[in-house]
Regions:
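Helical mechanochemical/support elements of P-loop NTPase systems and associated helical scaffolds
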Residues: 14-21, 32, 44, 48-51, ...
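Conserved nucleotide-binding/hydrolysis micro-motifs of P-loop NTPases
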Residues: 6, 15, 38-39, 70-74, ...
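Hydrophobic aliphatic residues
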Residues: 3-4, 56, 68, 138, ...
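Extended helical scaffolds that flank P-loop GTPase cores
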Residues: 117, 144, 150-262
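Conserved G1/Walker A P-loop phosphate-binding module
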Residues: 1-44, 58-59
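Conserved C-terminal guanine-recognition region of P-loop GTPase G domains, centered on the G4
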Residues: 28, 51-121
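Canonical P-loop GTPase G-domain recognition
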Residues: 99-155
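Residue-level preference for well-ordered alpha-helical positions
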Residues: 1, 113, 139, 171, ...
């Protein structure tokens, strides 16, 4: 609503927006903003997730504004990592910064930007704070197609490198299929490992490739002693929480938005 000047219904929880809604950014009639349902993952298990995922995968937007609740960043990390795998220019908007301030918290923005390799903009949609900066960053990354850095969160040295080897083996196995299906290979590999049937159908693997995929996944499961049907990106989440991004969340420090560090 702040971007387009519309009065659509908004809320704090996923599912409020049932379908996509389009509008132009105020003062910039040559732009198009598509409001998609709020979700916490790109898994196709709810109508909201299906609407959002189909749009992002099939309509190839020039940029994404990923709006995250700044009071509960960790809950949105999984979706953020999935979006980064799509190789689409993205800006991370930390909304509800007014509540962060009121609760005596601070977020070190430059550490998040360094960790994720994308612009991070603190905003308060309710108080119209940071919206102009958000629009400027979004238009810039869309115009110049500045895509997220390719970050391998699960590096070869983490926990024996089982997830790293699994993902890269699957990427090598499915690369040609993913390109033909128009799906970014890292996103396709992680979702295939997690048993995403819609992605597997689009990849059109032959029987031998399906058996190789299953073998790779079982090998990783045996090395890590867990089931990959839990989100494979759990590894990424653990690393992020141990990283500078986790360290950037420091309660009871900032007293005003001017103290939110860049």
């Amino acid at each position: 609503n702040q971007l387009t000047g519309s009065s659509q219904h908004v809320g704090n929880f996923p599912g409020v927006t049932v379908d996509r809604k389009d509008g132009s950014i105020r003062g910039k009639s040559n732009t198009l903003v598509t409001d998609l349902p709020g979700i916490y993952s790109m898994s196709p298990y709810s109508s909201e997730e299906i609407v959002t995922r189909n749009f992002v995968l099939n309509e190839h937007p020039r940029g994404i504004i990923n709006i995250v609740d700044a009071t509960n960043i960790e809950r949105n990390l999984y979706l953020t990592m999935q979006l980064m795998e799509l190789d689409i220019p993205m800006v991370l908007a930390l909304n509800m910064m007014d509540e962060v301030r009121e609760n005596g918290g601070s977020i070190i923005i430059n550490r998040m930007e360094e960790m994720l390799g994308i612009p991070v903009v603190p905003i308060s949609a309710a108080k119209n704070e940071g919206i102009d900066e958000l629009v400027a960053h979004a238009l810039h990354v869309a115009k110049y197609q500045e895509k997220p850095e390719k970050i391998d969160f699960c590096d070869a040295d983490d926990d024996g490198g089982a997830v790293h080897r699994c993902l890269h083996a699957i990427m090598h196995l499915i690369e040609d299929h993913a390109q033909e299906a128009g799906i970014p290979v890292r996103f396709a590999a992680a979702n295939a490992a997690e048993g995403d049937q819609l992605i597997l159908e689009k990849l059109k693997l032959d029987q031998n490739e399906k058996e190789m995929l299953e073998h790779i996944v079982k090998q990783m499961e045996s090395e890590r002693d867990w089931t990959v049907r839990l989100p494979l990106r759990t590894c990424d989440l653990i690393l992020l929480k141990k990283s500078a991004m986790r360290q950037s969340l420091s309660p009871k420090r900032a007293r005003s938005i001017s103290e939110v560090q860049r």
